Amino acid sequence: MIIHCAAQPSHDYAKNFPILDFNINATGSLNLLELTKRYCPKAPFIFMSTNKVYGDNPNKLKISEKKNRWELNKNDKYFKGINEKFSIDDCTHSFFGVSKTYADLIVQEYGRNIGLKTVCFRGGCLTGPNHSGTKLHGFLSYLVKISLSKKKYSLIGYKGKQVRDNLHSYDLVNAFWEFFKNPTKGEVYNMGGGRYSNCSIIEALDLVENISNIKIKREVIKKPRVGDHIWYISDLSKFKKHYPNWKQKYNTKKIIEELVDDFEVK
């Protein structure tokens, strides 16, 4: 089995160094597929893609402002999350999103055209106790680190009410395992916390404060990052239908509790 998680993950870095970003995310993925085809064509090939393949299209949804988050109406067709049929066209992806979209599509093509047992998991915010989050990526891990270090946390754009779904590495690896036991060719799954595990940045900060008993300094920066999602929750229905034995163990509160405990131990 090949599990391809290697990437250049920073939007800002990709904008400043687009050729290097493309070489890493796109060409690097193509090289791995060619090597798999040549030396181990029967091995399942798992690619960790990203929800950024959808660009900023989720921002075109009818999103309402609530007290601490942006949210969809419960009657909205996407209330339970973005599914795999959501458009990846006619939108701003960011340079990072473009290189990852190429990788996503070429992984699908090697499955459907060449016959490799490939799958793309389009991830939301993925994390766990050993995640070394930074300002440019690793949302929850970085938030916990800055908060418990008693530094000021910057909420960039959308009043800090933008929503993300959060998936623990334990649950993600179990999804990989389910696919490994029964692989298909050229499949795509949205993979995140879904409605079971999601929060806004404000809600995440409030959770950290309640868990750690530390008051967090905050500043709001009005200008959002290019292509940033106002609201994104993954619809996990397709994967759960294909792999009904997969169950989530960690919700956002449990994830943050583990991140706080890990930081305090370190």
Region spans (language model):
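N-terminal Rossmann-like NAD(P)+-binding domain of SDR-like oxidoreductases, especially those catalyzing
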Residues: 1-124
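Conserved mid-core alpha-helix of short-chain dehydrogenase/reductase
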Residues: 31-34, 166, 171-174, 178
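Glycine/proline-rich active-site loop of Rossmann-fold NAD(P)-dependent oxidoreductases
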Residues: 101, 114-117, 127-142, 151, ...
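C-terminal "lid/loop" region of Rossmann-like NAD(P)-dependent oxidoreductases
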Residues: 158-159, 188-189, 202-205, 213-231
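Conserved C-terminal active-site "lid" loop/helix of NAD(P)H-dependent oxidoreductases
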Residues: 169, 188, 224-247, 251
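Non-catalytic, hydrophobic alpha-helical segments
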Residues: 169-172, 176, 191, 201-204, ...
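Amphipathic terminal alpha-helices
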Residues: 237-238, 250-266
